Design a protein with these regions (language model features):
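N-terminal short secondary-structure element
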Residues: 1-31, 36
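A short LG(V/I)-centered, amphipathic sequence patch enriched
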Residues: 41-61
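Central regulatory/effector-binding core of bacterial HTH transcription factors
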Residues: 88, 92-154, 217, 223-224
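A late-sequence structural motif
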Residues: 107, 258-301
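Acidic, Gly/Pro-rich loop/turn segments at junctions of secondary structure
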Residues: 118, 129-192, 245-251, 266
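Hydrophobic hinge/microswitch elements
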Residues: 130-143, 149, 202-259, 314-315
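Beta-alpha-beta core module
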Residues: 155-161, 165-166, 188, 228-277
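Secondary-structure junction motif
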Residues: 178-179, 193-214, 280-289, 295-308
Length: 316
């Protein structure tokens, strides 16, 4: 038995038993993945996966039990690698933050500035992605902290702390007819071509839910991953734009006006996520404390390091 075999078991569950995706995630070949699975099953004398021909459909009962153990072993192995750093150098290193464009561009600058004043020898790496990509980076230990409005708070492998709540607002040209409607309604917005975020990011689900509750179908002609792209196409006259309220910027909005839509769409929460049970350097805890003064380092540590093996659920 070896770590690669355990990684394959864990990744198979994460990738819905698609061995091609498992091989891609672990930078190996599909034949190599299949060989490792066969060798581990032969060594243990059990069937780990439910099969139909060569296709994996799920996990057997022994396989489910093995998955929980594999997750614990791999997480502890990661902690061992971090242990030396924790005790030898706690004021320098690299802090990797996986976040969405909106948070990287509009919410994090002041926090990062304050963090650098406290830890001038820590280098920061910002990785921008979707909430799903951010969660995967946390799962794999490729990011220390994940920041997003979607996905992080309902992942049993992660611990998520609230940062702040934010609403959407509507961007339109100064002379647009919607500027004359008070209060703004979903019915009036639905009459115009709409530009907003793509599925799965920056509160898009709140937008879709609001229109669905009214039995309306928004005419979303263009969806994008970040606010700046949305603003660009609104400025070109392609449509009106629904964006995060905190994404304001005078230069890119000089020919646009923002309209309040807090009464139309539910507010969103930005979450700070960490991998459950993973040791961290002190500056990781302090970064979270800078984001949310209501959190103490002791409380963050306690929640992150709580035993949660029974909560791991890969939909098996």
């Amino acid at each position: 038995m070896n770590f690669q075999q355990l990684k394959i078991i864990r990744e198979a569950a994460r990738q819905d038993y698609n061995l091609t995706e498992v091989a891609n995630m672990l930078f190996t070949s599909q034949s190599g993945v299949s060989r490792h699975i066969r060798e581990l099953e032969d060594e243990l004398g059990i069937e780990i996966f439910v099969r139909r021909g060569k296709r994996l459909l799920g996990m057997t009962e022994p396989g489910k039990a093995l998955l929980v153990i594999a997750e614990r072993i791999l997480n502890e192995a990661s902690n061992v690698r971090r242990l030396a750093d924790l005790f030898t150098n706690d004021t320098s290193g690299v802090l990797t933050i996986a976040t969405t464009h909106t948070q990287a561009r509009y919410s994090l600058p002041e926090v990062i500035k304050a963090f650098r004043e406290l830890f001038p020898e820590v280098r920061l790496e910002l990785i921008q992605g979707t909430p799903q990509e951010i969660a995967t980076l946390l799962h794999n230990g490729e990011a220390d902290i994940g920041i997003a409005s979607e996905r992080l708070s309902n992942d049993p492998q992660l611990v998520a702390f609230p940062w702040f709540r934010w609403p959407h607002s509507l961007l339109v040209p100064h002379d647009h007819p919607l500027t004359q409607i008070t209060p703004l309604t979903l019915e009036s917005i639905a009459k115009w071509p709409l530009i907003t975020y793509r599925q799965g990011i920056t509160g898009r689900s709140r937008i879709d839910d609001a229109f669905a509750r009214k039995g309306l179908l928004a005419d979303i002609i263009l969806s994008a991953q970040d606010s700046d792209v949305i603003k660009t196409y609104v400025a070109l006259g392609l449509g009106i734009g629904l964006v995060a309220e905190q994404s304001s910027g005078e230069q890119e909005e000089k020919n646009l006006i923002r309209l309040d839509t807090r009464h139309l769409f539910d507010a969103n929460t930005v979450w700070l996520g960490l991998k459950r049970g993973q040791l961290q350097r002190n500056y990781v805890w302090r970064f979270l404390e800078l984001c949310n003064a209501g959190l103490s380092v002791e409380d963050i540590k306690r929640q992150v390091m709580e035993n949660s093996e029974e909560e791991i659920d890969y939909q098996i």
